[in-house]
From Swiss-Prot:
Belongs to the aldolase class II family. MtnB subfamily. Binds 1 zinc ion per subunit. This is Methylthioribulose-1-phosphate dehydratase. Substrate binds at residue 100. The keyword Transit peptide does not apply. One of its GO terms (molecular function) is methylthioribulose 1-phosphate dehydratase activity. It comes from Ajellomyces dermatitidis (strain ER-3 / ATCC MYA-2586). It comes from the Eukaryota. The gene is MDE1. Gene3D superfamilies: Class II aldolase/adducin N-terminal domain (3.40.225.10). Zn(2+) binds at residues 117, 119, 202.
Length: 241
């Protein structure tokens, strides 16, 4: 398929009175995330897949101020690379496409319905603690905490239990967001049941089968990361012996 030329003319794709429409949900999610400190200073982002369309928040804008008309829309499936090959069917001319786009696409290729990227301080801190305690190859692990029940065991495997050990892989940061894609996909292959990947000194990518699941899983993980930092201060182990 050739690239769509008049990307700015499909405004109907982001115009809806339905609060559950992706073009309305993404601004609402970003306002919510800003309140948590997850998308400060234009960082982070969110994307939703509906049928054969991908809706994505723009790059380099104040996330708490995003409006439906700021949303990019991609035809799906679409190539990750090169960026010029991506099939935009709506592209606000005054804004930049999200640098997270190929990483979001990696999650959608795994069957996700929504992918969230945050710059949570708690996520960053646990990546540093894991590096200090386990080295660069270590992953985040925690067990025997009630909130673990908010995380799936894997596709079609139900939710984790209180006595299960949650494992979240960590990848190294890169100078440019898009360059994280191959490492993210490698982590997805190594941990096929994961619904999240931490990025050291950067943040986290979380995805779910739909918007509600991605959001609640992101909330549960951030709770666990904050708890882990506080447990570390008290000398408490993350995984109960």
């Amino acid at each position: 398929m050739s690239a769509i030329k008049d990307e700015s003319n499909n405004d109907h794709l982001v115009q809806s009175h339905d609060p559950e429409h992706p073009a309305n949900l993404i601004p609402a999610l970003c306002r919510n995330f800003y309140g948590h400190g997850w998308v400060t200073g234009t960082g982070g982002g969110a994307s939703i897949k509906r049928d054969n369309h991908i809706f994505i928040a723009p790059s380099g804008v104040q996330k708490e101020l995003i409006q439906p008309h700021n949303i990019f829309v991609l035809q799906y499936p679409t190539p990750k690379y090169p960026p010029s090959a991506r099939q935009y069917i709506r592209k606000p001319l005054e804004l930049k496409p999200s640098a997270c786009t190929p990483l979001f696409l990696a999650a959608f290729d795994r069957g996700a319905g929504c992918c969230i990227h945050t710059h949570s301080q708690w996520a960053v801190l646990v990546t540093l603690l894991v590096e200090r305690e386990k080295g660069l190859e270590g992953c985040f692990e925690i067990s025997n905490i009630e909130q673990i029940k908010g995380i799936p065991k894997g596709k079609g495997k139900g939710m984790m239990g209180f006595f299960d050990t949650l494992k979240i892989p960590i990848i190294e940061n890169t100078a440019f967001e898009e360059d994280l894609t191959s490492s993210l996909e490698e982590a997805m292959e190594k941990y096929p049941d994961t619904y999240a990947v931490l990025v050291r000194r950067h943040g986290i990518y979380v995805w779910g089968d739909d918007v509600a699941k991605a959001k609640t899983q992101c909330e549960s993980l951030d709770y666990l990361f904050q708890l882990a930092v506080e447990m570390h201060k008290l000398g408490l182990p993350w995984v109960k012996p």
